[in-house]
């Protein structure tokens, strides 16, 4: 089956042609603004000028006639509206002219599926990093789920914005990578990981301040990469444990960065996960990836009429069924993204020793700082939670030099393992989170892997929590929990309804927090 795919969500218009056996052609034309970032109307004008040319060239390279095409696929979203409209119009015109079926493709889905095809990955956790997108994605329950993403700007846009202020033209990423190789001094930048999500606006603000103060651009570039990439790899590792996968795949324009590739590969070696890299020729937006996703969708029985092909600039990957994926499920025992757990004895009491292990992918200086800060913070948050009557482990010993905590054992099952069989437990979770929040305590990583269900609801691994939390911090807790539940259960809305009823009943400011949760979702410009 020969599929023609058209990509045009942002700065690139591209046509790819492939079948089940080979990629026959992939032709692209990229809009490069003379100054500043992407101007949507100018990008669309570029696509209008080039779309016929790239289609004709791709057909020529493929050595086929237009009538040989069996299916037309195009990027339906997410992306810039003007660019999407040009692409969809061209695809519809082609499909109608050739009297062939048409199918609209989710842009991130294309990145995943071309990466899998070229690398041999079967069921990976994907780190999708580009100008507008920063997401950690895995297939669970019939769909790809977004396990973590940016809460503000995409990492590629952050790098490009810094580059513009530093006088580097678009795209700035490759030049920042070159400059970073000559950097020697690690400047302190915000390390903003919130559960499974990240935030890069603080890094940009601090980096620009360093630029104004006259710090060498090489050192700033070096510090941006080391800090931002460490955040990404940390969340990626956490996603492996949450999803039960043992493969990692990288895609998107930022995935071309050799330092990021090196860090992801090192993390994979540390946790015994297989790391796959999308061929660099296909990391950037391209038509072949749209053709590949369209091929899989069509062969799985998915069909669209012309009237179903309206563009969707906010089209999320978790809205798309992906029945062709065969899921894996790996059990990681006594391990997490932050630490290793060892059963021990503390003066006759059953205990666990939580060892915050060094991360080889992080610079030693940064790693020492992060591990030390988080262990100290976990000790503080646990103590405050116990004072508030919340079930948490007892801290028997705190060793800041060895970076270990010795804690009491909590018997029970993880929420992720019981949530389907015992959905009514969510009311109890809502009650205890309300108590936590009423005492101005946030957990910081409130996922289904950090809640234990026994005769009580108990919380573990609060190393990213706060003891004088703002409403925004409390909202991130609820947002993180909701996302982790939705990623694992098709009944997420029902489960969260039980949670929210109890949360509202036991926390006077619950509605304020839940309104901020919705605001966080609206702030997700990059989907």
From Swiss-Prot:
Q: Which Gene3D superfamilies match?
A: 3.30.420.40, Phosphorylase Kinase, domain 1, Transferase(Phosphotransferase) domain 1
**Residue ranges occupied by any Protein kinase domain in the UniProt entry:** 330-527
Q: List the InterPro entries.
A: ATPase_NBD, Bud32, Gcp-like_dom, KAE1/TsaD, Kae1_archaea_euk, Kinase-like_dom_sf, Peptidase_M22_CS, tRNA_threonyl_synthase/kinase
Could you say which enzyme class this protein belongs to?
transferase
**Which PROSITE patterns does the entry mention?**
GLYCOPROTEASE, PROTEIN_KINASE_TYR
- Spans annotated as Kae1: 1-324
Give GO MF terms, alphabetically.
Answer: ATP binding; iron ion binding; metalloendopeptidase activity; N(6)-L-threonylcarbamoyladenine synthase activity; protein serine kinase activity; protein serine/threonine kinase activity; protein serine/threonine/tyrosine kinase activity; zinc ion binding
Q: Where is the active site?
A: 445
Which note does the record give on the cofactor?
Binds 1 Fe(2+) ion per subunit.
Cofactor or coenzyme needed:
Fe(2+)
- Entry's EC annotation: 2.3.1.234, 2.7.11.1
- Protein name (Swiss-Prot/TrEMBL): Probable bifunctional tRNA threonylcarbamoyladenosine biosynthesis protein
Task: State the organism named in the record.
Answer: Thermoplasma volcanium (strain ATCC 51530 / DSM 4299 / JCM 9571 / NBRC 15438 / GSS1)
């Amino acid at each position: 089956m020969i599929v023609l795919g058209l990509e045009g969500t942002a700065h690139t218009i591209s046509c790819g042609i492939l079948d089940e056996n080979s990629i026959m052609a992939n032709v692209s034309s990229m809009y490069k603004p003379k100054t500043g970032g992407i101007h949507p109307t100018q990008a669309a004008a570029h696509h209008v000028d080039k779309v016929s040319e790239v289609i004709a060239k791709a057909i020529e390279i493929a050595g086929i006639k237009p009538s040989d095409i069996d299916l037309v696929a195009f990027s339906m979203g997410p992306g810039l509206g003007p660019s999407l409209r040009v692409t969809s119009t061209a695809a519809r015109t082609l499909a109608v002219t050739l009297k062939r079926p048409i199918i609209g493709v989710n842009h991130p889905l294309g990145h995943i599926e071309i990466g899998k095809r070229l690398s041999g990955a079967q069921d990976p956790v994907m780190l999708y990093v580009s100008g507008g997108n920063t997401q950690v994605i895995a297939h669970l329950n019939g769909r790809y789920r977004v396990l973590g993403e940016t809460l503000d700007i995409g990492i590629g846009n952050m790098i490009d914005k810094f580059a513009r202020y530093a006088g580097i033209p678009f795209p700035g990423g490759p030049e920042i990578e070159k400059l970073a190789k000559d950097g020697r001094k690690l400047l302190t930048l915000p390390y903003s990981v919130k559960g499974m999500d990240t935030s890069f606006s603080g890094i940009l603000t601090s980096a620009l301040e360093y630029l104004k103060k006259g710090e060498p651009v090489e050192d700033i570039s070096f510090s941006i990469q080391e800090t931002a990439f460490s955040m990404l790899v940390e969340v990626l590792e956490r996603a492996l444990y949450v999803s039960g996968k043992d493969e990692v795949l990288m895609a998107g324009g930022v995935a071309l960065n050799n330092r990021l590739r090196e860090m992801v590969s090192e993390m994979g070696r540390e946790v015994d996960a297989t790391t796959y890299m999308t061929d660099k020729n296909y990391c950037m937006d391209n038509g072949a990836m749209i053709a590949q996703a369209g091929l899989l969708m069509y062969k799985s029985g998915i069909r669209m009429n012309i009237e179903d092909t309206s563009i969707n600039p906010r089209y999320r990957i978790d809205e798309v069924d992906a029945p062709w994926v065969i899921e894996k499920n790996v059990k990681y025992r006594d391990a997490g993204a932050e630490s290793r757990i060892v059963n021990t004895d503390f003066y006759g009491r059953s205990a666990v020793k939580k060892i915050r292990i060094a991360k080889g992918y992080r610079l030693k200086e940064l790693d020492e700082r992060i591990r030390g800060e988080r262990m100290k913070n976990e000790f503080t948050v646990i103590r405050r939670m116990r004072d508030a009557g919340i079930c948490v482990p007892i801290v028997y010993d705190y060793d800041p030099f060895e970076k270990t905590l010795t804690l009491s054992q909590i018997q029970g099952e993880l929420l992720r393992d019981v949530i389907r069989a015992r959905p009514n437990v969510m009311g109890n979770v809502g009650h205890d989170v309300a108590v936590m929040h009423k005492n101005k305590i946030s957990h910081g990583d409130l996922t289904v892997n950090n809640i234990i269900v026994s005769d009580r609801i108990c919380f573990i691994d609060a190393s990213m929590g706060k003891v004088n939390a703002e409403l925004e911090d409390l909202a991130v807790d609820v947002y993180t929990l909701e996302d982790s539940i939705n990623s694992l259960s098709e009944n997420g809305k029902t489960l969260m309804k039980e949670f929210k009823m109890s949360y509202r009943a036991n926390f006077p400011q619950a509605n304020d927090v839940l309104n901020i949760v919705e605001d966080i979702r609206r702030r997700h410009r990059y989907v």
